[in-house]
A protein has these predicted regions:
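Conserved G/P- and acidic residue-centered "switch" motifs that form tight phosphate/ATP-binding loops
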Residues: 75, 116, 146
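Conserved active-site alpha-helix within GNAT-family acetyltransferase domains
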Residues: 119, 145-160
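Generic domain-boundary/flexible-linker signal
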Residues: 92-94, 115, 149
Length: 183
C-alpha cells in the first residue's frame, strides 16, 4: 500500500486498443528528457529546461511515484499522465472545502499530438481512478491560451468551475465527477 490509502501502486498496466499506461522504466529516460526540454511541450508549463541540466538531474528510472503513468505506443513512451497529485490548499481552484483533490496532468511528445492519444490515455486513466477511488473528484487546471488542452478537457467531460490568474496567465479550472463544487 502507499499514501493512496486503499489503492495499491503500481496498478497492472492499463491497456487500450493501441496504448499502454504503465509505471516508468529505465528505457523511458530519453523520452522524459525530451518532454522537459521541448519548447513545444513546455510552452504553457514554464518553458523548456536546459537539456544538459536534465541529463544530470533525471534519475535512471524517472517518474517512479504513485499516480504517475507513462503512456506507451508500441512499447515506446509518447507521454505521461499524473493523476494522484493532490492540489495544494494554498493554490486557487478547489471543489471541496478541505481541498486536496486529485489533479489530472498530462504531457505528450509533439509527434504524438493530433492523433487522439491524449484523449484515449486520459480517459483510460480517469476510468481507472473512478474504479479505484469511487466518488472522488478529479480537477484539471490549464491556461486558457492552451487551445489543445482546453479542447481535451471538454472532450474528457470536465466542467468549468472557475477562471483565475496564476503563473502570470489566465487559468481554466474544471472538475470531472458528479461532485457539486462549493462556493
Amino acid at each position: 500500500m502507499t499514501e493512496l490509502g486503499p489503492v495499491a501502486w503500481p496498478p497492472a498496466p492499463i491497456r487500450s486498443e493501441r496504448l499502454v499506461l504503465r509505471e516508468s522504466e529505465a528505457r523511458d529516460r530519453a523520452a522524459f528528457i525530451e518532454l522537459f526540454a521541448s519548447p513545444e511541450v513546455r510552452t504553457y508549463l514554464g518553458g523548456p529546461r536546459p537539456r544538459d541540466e536534465l541529463e544530470r538531474a533525471v534519475p535512471e528510472i524517472p517518474g517512479r511515484r504513485p499516480g504517475f503513468f507513462v503512456v506507451a505506443l508500441d512499447g515506446a513512451m509518447i507521454g505521461t499522465i499524473t493523476l494522484l497529485d493532490r492540489r495544494d490548499a494554498e493554490r486557487p481552484g478547489h471543489v471541496r472545502l478541505e481541498a486536496g483533490e486529485a489533479e489530472l496532468g498530462y504531457m505528450f511528445l509533439p509527434e504524438a499530438w493530433g492523433c487522439g492519444y491524449a484523449a484515449k490515455a486520459c480517459a483510460a486513466a480517469l476510468d481507472w481512478f473512478a474504479d479505484a477511488l469511487p466518488g472522488e473528484p478529479v480537477v484539471l487546471c490549464t491556461q486558457t491560451a492552451n487551445d489543445r488542452s482546453m479542447h481535451l478537457a471538454a472532450k474528457l467531460g470536465f466542467t468549468e468551475v472557475e477562471r483565475f490568474e496564476e503563473w502570470g496567465a489566465e487559468q481554466w479550472f474544471g472538475v470531472w465527477s458528479l461532485v457539486t463544487p462549493f462556493g
